[in-house]
Amino acid sequence: MINSTSTQPPDESCSQNLLITQQIIPVLYCMVFIAGILLNGVSGWIFFYVPSSKSFIIYLKNIVIADFVMSLTFPFKILGDSGLGPWQLNVFVCRVSAVLFYVNMYVSIVFFGLISFDRYYKIVKPLWTSFIQSVSYSKLLSVIVWMLMLLLAVPNIILTNQSVREVTQIKCIELKSELGRKWHKASNYIFVAIFWIVFLLLIVFYTAITKKIFKSHLKSSRNSTSVKKKSSRNIFSIVFVFFVCFVPYHIARIPYTKSQTEAHYSCQSKEILRYMKEFTLLLSAANVCLDPIIYFFLCQPFREILCKKLHIPLKAQNDLDISRIKRGNTTLESTDTL
């Protein structure tokens, strides 16, 4: 699915900036890899101590797994793009690791969508009890999400089956069969559609949540300002990460995919679209470094255990507990877990 390790054969290629593709981008991915492994390793360690007692927690744990696995694909891309690895490594990137990259990226996106729905249901519709918020249902839904993403992506592994000679530069699309190219195009459109649907639902749900919380706190002046700021911060952090990390890539993805699978694009146009895709894909990859920050803002149990492990006292915890007991409102209880 990623064709970043490759360029056109010499007789068909335009002038290329190898400084960008073979040095700058690999170095940036190396930085993201180191930060991503460390941050998600710590996040996984902390979540190991967080009980899976709520659907919200289960979805977050799935995101941690997806981000960690996605981070493990970065070294293959780094070695392939920089030319430090053997040519067979580029084939492996085209056939396997790039597909795993996309699977885990979209798994993460879908689970953030499920979290927004779960928070909407609990905060805006607290009296509507439903089995969809049960732990068992959330675990089943998590399995279904992983299976569906794999079903969409695995054919890209199977259908990238064309033989390849020993070359220094490989174009991933040329390793696909005719059916593989069609599936590549269709699956990319489906994944892009999934993102935009989740992104729009995210905006709708969190707009409704914000209105609900602000209306709730209009009834009480105590701690109203601080709670509003906290709620706004939590919501803004999620939407900000989605907008910065994923929107640019999904704007660039469609024209880039068309340039791969349609013949009327000029060589120069293909190169420009490839650079756009590479840099926006890097932004998407950087999401693995930002998600742990979201966990800290979003999940109170995560925050409490992390601070406990680091021996950092939580500020105003007593005031928060008193406020919850005094008001006894479901919306208020959910403020720290948006």
UniProtKB/Swiss-Prot annotation:
Residues 51-55, 118-139, 210-234, 300-338 are cytoplasmic. Its main location: membrane. It is a multi-pass membrane protein. GO terms for biological process: G protein-coupled receptor signaling pathway; hematopoietic stem cell homeostasis. Glycans are attached at residues 3, 161. Highest expression in the placenta, adipose tissue, stomach and intestine, intermediate levels in the brain, spleen, lung and heart, lowest levels in the kidney. GO terms for molecular function: G protein-coupled purinergic nucleotide receptor activity; G protein-coupled UDP receptor activity. Keywords: Cell membrane, Disulfide bond, G-protein coupled receptor, Glycoprotein, Membrane, Receptor, Transducer, Transmembrane, Transmembrane helix. The keyword Glycoprotein applies. Belongs to the G-protein coupled receptor 1 family. This is P2Y purinoceptor 14. It comes from Homo sapiens (Human). The gene is P2RY14.
